[in-house]
């Protein structure tokens, strides 16, 4: 494995698609792992998958943290988008309802508060897609519930509108990712749902063009992420201090916790069921994605080479 001095220093622009991704990037920055691979990263938030992809293709950014659904359709269109690693492969949402329910199947005929399927720019709202899969997996059709759409994208504004809609009885139920304490305090029923395999979180998304542009770019990205994950999993006290600093600086990240990085996979391979579900969501919106295998999006050889070298196993020896 190359040492930091072996890499040509580069500076890149990047987007993160959710503030929940920030913890691992904070660790890479503050613990020196970007420096170790000689990359300076200028991260900015982007709330639309279509805008992030446009920036990738026109060269405004070289990396996107996220974009989990629409890339499969872009591959079918001949675009050079590629994903290199998936540190998280599942979601565990909760169903909040006005009346207690024992399963998602019991919301037939109910009003469900959510985002639109697509934002104003045409980008896919991944969270809404997850909720659609929960409905389908329960044996219902998407038309068996009434979708009350209160925002065109996942945001703090949506979360405020979501809670308001439930309080004002504009909806009967809603799916919530993360903390549901305010709903419980308001007297709503909360049902923990089973884990849904799904590509999500700080996925490394770039293009074949960029991989060819910079010296060993894919190798460096994967190595830095693997090192950051190892640090988080083995240096809890230092990681929690970094996250406290992040929460003080970024209001949108105030809900992050140590578990948000401790749960990341030591070997961030995508799970096959998670890929299948992400691909399924894409095909629902863009049937042309069916023309190519979902595996065409993934280039895992950088991770496989790192893994095969024994580097990752050696990191965790003696834990």
Regions found by a protein language model. Give the residues of each.
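Short, glycine-/small- and polar/acidic-enriched structural segments
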Residues: 2-149, 175, 190-198
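Extracytoplasmic/secreted proteins, especially bacterial periplasmic and envelope-associated proteins
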Residues: 23, 29, 51, 55, ...
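Structured segments of extracytoplasmic/periplasmic soluble domains
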Residues: 31, 55, 59, 110, ...
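Pocket-lining segment of extracytoplasmic ligand-binding domains
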Residues: 69, 150, 154-246
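Small-molecule pocket liners
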Residues: 89-95, 199-204, 208-209, 278
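Proline/Glycine/Serine-rich low-complexity intrinsically disordered segments
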Residues: 101-105, 208, 212, 267
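Secondary-structure end/capping motifs
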Residues: 214-291
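Conserved C-terminal helix/tail region of periplasmic/extracytoplasmic solute-binding proteins
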Residues: 283-319
């Amino acid at each position: 494995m190359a040492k930091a001095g072996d890499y040509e220093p580069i500076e890149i622009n990047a987007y993160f698609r959710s503030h929940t991704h920030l913890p691992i990037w904070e660790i890479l920055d503050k613990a020196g792992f970007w420096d170790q691979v000689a990359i300076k990263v200028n991260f900015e938030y982007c709330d639309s998958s279509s805008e992030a992809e446009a920036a990738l293709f026109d060269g405004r950014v070289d990396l996107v943290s996220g974009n989990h659904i629409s890339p499969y359709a872009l591959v079918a269109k001949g675009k050079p988008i590629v994903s290199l690693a998936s540190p998280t492969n599942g979601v565990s949402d909760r169903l909040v309802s006005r009346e207690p329910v024992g399963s998602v199947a019991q919301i037939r005929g109910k009003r469900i508060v959510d985002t639109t399927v697509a934002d104003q720019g045409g980008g896919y709202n991944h969270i809404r897609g997850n909720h659609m899969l929960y409905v389908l997996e329960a044996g219902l059709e998407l038309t068996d519930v009434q979708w009350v759409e209160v925002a065109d994208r996942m945001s703090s504004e949506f979360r405020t509108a979501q809670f308001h809609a439930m309080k004002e009885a504009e909806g009967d139920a809603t799916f919530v990712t993360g903390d549901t304490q305010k709903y419980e305090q308001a007297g709503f029923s909360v049902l923990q749902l089973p884990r849904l395999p799904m590509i999500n979180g700080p996925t490394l998304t770039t293009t074949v063009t960029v991989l060819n542009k910079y010296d060993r770019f894919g190798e460096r990205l994967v190595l830095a992420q693997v090192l950051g994950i190892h640090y988080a999993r083995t240096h809890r006290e230092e990681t929690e201090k970094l996250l406290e600093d992040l929460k003080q600086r970024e209001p949108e990240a105030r809900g992050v916790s140590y578990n948000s990085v401790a749960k990341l996979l030591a070997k961030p391979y995508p799970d096959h069921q998670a890929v299948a579900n992400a691909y399924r969501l894409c095909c629902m919106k863009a049937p042309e994605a069916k023309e190519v295998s979902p595996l065409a999006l993934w280039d895992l050889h950088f991770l496989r080479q790192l893994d095969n070298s024994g580097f990752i196993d050696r990191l965790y020896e003696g834990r």
